[in-house]
Amino acid sequence: MSSPELPSQMGVPNGHTKLQEVTPDTPLDEVFQKWEEDGGVIIKGILAPAQVTQLREELQPLLDTFQRGSTTDIEPLKRFHGSQTKRAGGLTNCSAIFRDYLLDNDFLHAIAARCFGSGGRPGVHAYWISSANTINVGPGQPAQVLHRDLGNYPHYHLLGPDGPESQATFLIATTDFTDANGATRIIPGSQKWPFNQTWNPSQSIPSEMHAGDCLLFGGKVVHGTGANTTNAERGCVAFTFCANHLTPEEAHPHIVDINIVRKLSERAQRSLGFRSQYPRGAPGLWMEGYNEVATRLGLDSK
């Protein structure tokens, strides 16, 4: 006769009541120290005010074509996506600010290379973009259920809190984030909990920040969009890198205009999946035969 299963234990936050802040000039060692302490860190001033304004203007025609809520018939997914939330993808096609200042941002790529590196070496060729979309939360949107993003990749879940990160997400605020308008909430320190531990929404804190700032977090931390109790929309671009042996959320090679891709840097092309992938120790993934897929696409002059 087997013994009864013990109930899950409630996790305990690390006691921080506000997320720590860095800037694009902060040394990576300090960025990662703060990120590893809380599971999330605010990067101040990723975009300048004029860039935020232009980004909003470039995204508005796209947002005008999207309905609020989800197109799925699956009720739990509808609630997860948010009935008053606009999630629009394909940002590379419609925004020069996204292409020039986020997709090809040296600081964001430096963070990704370190996050997905191994053996003390940066993983310059170890990641690509999982998704890039808006999460624009309208008035009256209830709080999202708290969750961990690594649920997309079950084998990473099996590795537990000591396993590597499957993804790194940058939430770039296009409006101010406040507690009242639905700032993304994080339970600080929850990325270190055993994954069978439970939590309570009251343990979460809001990632309050200004437009142009960015929230960085990984796949292991417990988080979720807050409730928008105001009369104004809370806007952001959610930009996620994942290890490039994993399937991305967004199928960029089927979405992004090849004529736009031709004008991008090799790094940006690789990040979007228009070049083959070379994680450390691999002879190549995402190939055409055993050849670089970019050559087949006419992106190389060789």
UniProtKB/Swiss-Prot annotation:
Q: Name one Pfam family in it.
A: PhyH
Residues that bind Fe cation, according to the entry?
Answer: 147, 149, 223
Function of the molecule: Dioxygenase; part of the gene cluster that mediates the biosynthesis of the host-selective toxins (HSTs) AAL-toxins, sphinganine-analog mycotoxins responsible for Alternaria stem canker on tomato by the tomato pathotype. ALT1 also selectively transfers methyl groups at the first and the third cycle of chain elongation for AAL toxin.
Hey, which family's this protein in?
A: Belongs to the PhyH family.
Which InterPro entries does the record cross-reference, listed alphabetically? Phytyl_CoA_dOase-like (IPR008775)
State the Gene Ontology terms under molecular function.
Answer: dioxygenase activity; metal ion binding
Query: Which keywords fit this entry according to its UniProt record?
Result: Dioxygenase, Iron, Metal-binding, Oxidoreductase
Q: What is its EC number?
A: 1.14.11.-
Q: Does the keyword Metal-binding apply?
A: yes
How would you summarize the oligomeric state and partners of this protein? Homodimer.
Give the pathway annotation. Mycotoxin biosynthesis
Domain of life of the source: Eukaryota
Top enzyme class of this protein?
oxidoreductase
Signal sequence, start to end: none
Task: Provide the residue span(s) of the region labelled Disordered.
Answer: 1-22
Q: Which cofactor does it need?
A: Fe cation
What else is noted?
Gene clusters encoding host-selective toxins (HSTs) are localized on conditionally dispensable chromosomes (CDCs), also called supernumerary chromosomes, where they are present in multiple copies. The CDCs are not essential for saprophytic growth but controls host-selective pathogenicity.
Q: What is this protein called?
A: Dioxygenase ALT11
Q: Which gene encodes it?
A: ALT11b
- Repeat listed as a keyword: no
